[in-house]
Swiss-Prot record:
Transmembrane segments: 7-24, 362-382, 436-456, 475-495, 510-530
GO MF assignments: membrane insertase activity
Pfam families: 60KD_IMP (PF02096), YidC_periplas (PF14849)
Native organism taxonomy: Bacteria, Pseudomonadati, Pseudomonadota, Betaproteobacteria, Burkholderiales
Gene3D superfamilies: 2.70.98.90
Family note: Belongs to the OXA1/ALB3/YidC family. Type 1 subfamily.
Species this chain originates from: Burkholderia ambifaria (strain MC40-6)
Protein name: Membrane protein insertase YidC
Keyword Ligase: no
Biological processes annotated in GO: protein insertion into membrane; protein transport
Gene coding for it: yidC
Amino acid sequence: MDIKRTVLWVIFFMSAVMLYDNWQRSHGRPSMFFPSATQTAPAAAGGASGTGATTTTAGEVPAAAAGTAPSTTAPAAQAQLVKFSTDVYDGEIDTRGGTLAKLTLKKQGDGKQPDLYITLFDHTAGHTYLARTGLLGGDFPNHNDVYTQVNAGPTSLTGDQNALKLSFESPVKGGVKVVKTYTFTRGSYVIGVDTKIDNVGTAPVTPTVYMELVRDNTAVETPMFSHTFLGPAVYTDAKHFQKIDFSDLDKNKANFEKAADNGWVAMVQHYFASAWIPQQGAKRDIYAEKIDPALYRVGVKQPVAAIAPGQSADVQARLFAGPEEERMLEGIAPGLELVKDYGWVTIIAKPLFWLLEKIHGFVGNWGWAIVLLTVLIKAVFFPLSAASYKSMARMKEITPRMQALRERFKSDPQKMNAALMELYKTEKVNPFGGCLPVVIQIPVFISLYWVLLASVEMRGAPWILWIHDLSQRDPFFILPVLMAVSMFVQTSLNPTPPDPVQAKMMKFMPIAFSVMFFFFPAGLVLYYVVNNVLSIAQQYYITRKLGGVKKKPA
């Protein structure tokens, strides 16, 4: 019995340690087991240096960050920030490059919790995250040039207006003029980006359009134990979802699909993502690289057919910038829902989230949905749990006889083991009989953990009374205390190990885990508390009502 219990505790403890180590690595802290790349300081607002008259050849994307004043001998044009507002965004477009330089997601606070508003794109001294485009293939307009707003009018989506269009015109460079138009649609996190290329020169031109996301490696919203993958990602039909670690870009060893005519590129962070989605069928090269200390970019380069003098070409793309809401992402582009990263348990986690979502649609509260899903999972696994608890009850029944044998043969381990094996055989007890049912449930346990950790729906979602945000820790630590109590009760239902050291360890484990759970999101702790309470009820029912424990005469 003590061997089985030790195995279970080791499995549980190692799972917790690995999860903790993953949290450490996911937001820049050193791993307990593996060396990590040195974390560099956040890039300054200006990003890499560059000049307004940068000449780029095919394949070279200028590295200067939008907002950096170009260094030229001639007076530089003055860039401006054009503010705009829709029902889902507040933002700013920098006329230097016509770059989307700031984007705040208004619906995350739902008008009632402004502290939950999330600024996705930003360009400050402490944080850089931009979406920008330009032309390659000659001395053509790029993100370092100052654009002019075209037909300046209302910059807010008002009344029954369904869409807001903002257009910006570049200066003529290399015989080319660019008109960039952003289209914001009511209720949508997808922004239309149209790049019109006019050949106003006297010779044909064959430019290449680049579309990229630029970001530093600074995580936002970083309470302990609540972050998943942070960094670039690429999706193609051939290689599917490919995450790119900043540390791999530091070492110039990132491995991902470099060319395609489908898919998208993205920057992913906890709960939110942005992605450039070029037109399906348009051939493009894909790149991801480090461009400055702690500043990175991922993007595509899409060639444009030759444009004759006096003619023009349009390159249309979509830019997603919003929350990782799985159902919404599925309708935007193939594979985009994968930015909501469940890791290696995706095959189990996705159906669990689907079920959680259905339950929420019925009860209207994510906290109660977690409770009901936990009850449902326990019901499904009841036969396995029953087998485990019956085995534990039988082991508990023969524990006094096991202790007597250990005492009798304590000087001869070989005879003691033989006597124990004979006892197991006579009583038809398998000392590991309770392990397998628990091991089978571990992937589901871990999957539900990642579902609750990765789901933006938990952000700002209340449960009852003092729990106002299931994605944050319990402000009064009530749930962690309840979890500690439930773990102690579970421990007391099991026989005391004969080894005093092991007995002390069994008493210490609930305290150790509870301290760690003090900093877990409330939604996760709620799941553990409900799971423990149901496990206690199951164990009591099975051992007391199904004859698992028999009274022995004194």
